[in-house]
Structures are given as structure tokens and as C-alpha cells.
Amino acid sequence: PLYPASVKPIKGRVILVEGIFDMVNLFDKGLSNAICCFGTNNVNEDKLSILKMQDIMGVDIIFDGDDAGQKAAENVRFLAERVGLITRNVNLGQNIDPGSLAEQQVKNLKEKLYD
């Protein structure tokens, strides 16, 4: 599943991350629209369609910055666009994990994405 099942989007968008600790870190530091997929292999069109049913327009995909994470982000982006979601792949950089971002980094990310 995607967790939490219902989240309040910011400007019609949610952030999709890989793990629960990534989601909790972003949420705790001000990005309350973060959801996690519990691993990149758990994402499919049915799960992404639920977002569309909740009137969410877009998904900002923030997976790990390594090659595997970015490849998975591209796969999820393809699936999300097939169900009609507008997507962005936000690459934080090589070896940067959304679960390890400091408060100021999360604030800067929020401004970059939604201001």
C-alpha cells in the first residue's frame, strides 16, 4: 500500500518516497504531503490510481540518488503518467537519501517544489 492512505496535497501534489523513515523525516520537518511506497517494487498502476481518485494531480518522486533509486523513479514515473498523474523526478544527488535530510534542506526543498 501507499502510506498514509490519505494525505493533504500541497498545490495538488504529493511526494512519493521509498521508505517509512524517508516519509517520517520529510513530514516531521514540514513536508506534510509525503507518502511512502514501502520499496520501489510495491508500486503499480492500481495503487497510483487511488491518488487520482483523491483528486491528487501530481506526484513528486523522491527516491534515493543512487543508480538503482533513479531507475526505480523512472519506472514509477512511467506508471504514474499512465494513470494521468503529472510527475516530477526530484533527484537529490548521488548517495543522498530523503530520510537523512536536515531541517533546512527540507525547507529548501519545499520552497523549490511549491513556491
Pin down the residues of each PLM region.
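Phosphate-handling DNA/RNA-contact segment within nucleic-acid enzymes
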Residues: 1-55, 72-73
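Acidic beta-strand-to-loop metal/phosphate-binding motif
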Residues: 16, 54-68, 90-91
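Short secondary-structure boundary/capping segments
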Residues: 30-32, 76-78, 105
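Acidic, metal-coordinating catalytic cores used for nucleic-acid/nucleotide bond scission
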Residues: 40-44, 63-73, 94-97
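Short, aromatic/basic amphipathic alpha-helical patches
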Residues: 71-81
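Short acidic, glycine/proline-enriched helix-loop-strand junctions
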Residues: 82-87
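C-terminal or mid-to-C-terminal helical accessory/interaction module adjacent to the motor/catalytic core
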Residues: 89-97, 101-115
